[in-house]
């Protein structure tokens, strides 16, 4: 049995999956915001509860908005303050008495999609999230590749490439990022970035969904904005694909529901790739909000 936990800022979602990777249990509980011991106890109690229910000890994987420090394995996170700076994996292993794996939630999203029936035979899968932020995870041979410092796939914190600056023009905004740097892709390619760029160029704030609706209706500013954004996306995606060369790319997050992306990227990306490279297949995520808990559970698949 595979147990997965999606630990967010407000709730912890638990999921249990059998050997066929079918979900057989679900539970959601509030995330203790400032009580670390209660956070550890909450996770341990869910493990013990479902061990008793299934009559076996499930493997344990956690996905959270952050990562482990490569040197001391403490948690680096902003959205789960109770876990910030704490040795969560070590304390859970001591409490529960078995191995625990922890990964960034974007990596869990990518792993969930990579283990979908249609993608299980693909050698590599790149998951990209175009949501409130922009991030990703890289799956190779069915496993997360997270690198020496657990930051592989953190494409949202690479910088806007020079050809993207040329494309945006001399009036291009230098946007700040939550990581304290400027010019990160997170600030431009996310749903938030989509809105920030519109506000910058047109002097008015609009929600992404309203911009997309206006685009469908042929409103001039929205059409111009979407055209600019699609080319920006193609430039940045091409840079990422050149570095990772994935077989399949899966998009998640709210902006991934904009169907025009799937029409435009295969047409626009090739001119920014090396001449020998082909644009990978780009598809929409199938597992939506359940991707985090699925991927966390699947961290233990061998």
Swiss-Prot record:
Classification via SUPFAM superfamilies: Actin-like ATPase domain
UniProt keyword list: ATP-binding, Carbohydrate metabolism, Kinase, Metal-binding, Nucleotide-binding, Transferase, Zinc
Listed EC numbers: 2.7.1.59
Positions bound to Zn(2+): 157, 177, 179, 184
InterPro entries reported in the protein's UniProt record: ATPase_NBD, N-acetyl-D-glucosamine_kinase, ROK, ROK_cs
Pfam families found in the cross-reference section: ROK (PF00480)
Catalysis performed (reactions): N-acetyl-D-glucosamine + ATP = N-acetyl-D-glucosamine 6-phosphate + ADP + H(+)
Pathway the protein acts in: Cell wall biogenesis; peptidoglycan recycling
GO molecular function, one term: N-acetylglucosamine kinase activity
Coiled-coil regions listed in the entry: none
Alphabetized CDD domains for the sequence: ASKHA_NBD_ROK_NAGK (cd24057)
Keyword Kinase among record annotations: yes
Residues holding ATP: 4-11, 133-140
Entry keyword annotation includes Lyase: no
One GO term (biological process): peptidoglycan turnover
Role played: Catalyzes the phosphorylation of N-acetyl-D-glucosamine (GlcNAc) derived from cell-wall degradation, yielding GlcNAc-6-P.
HAMAP family: GlcNAc_kinase (MF_01271)
Family from the record: Belongs to the ROK (NagC/XylR) family. NagK subfamily.
Protein name as annotated: N-acetyl-D-glucosamine kinase
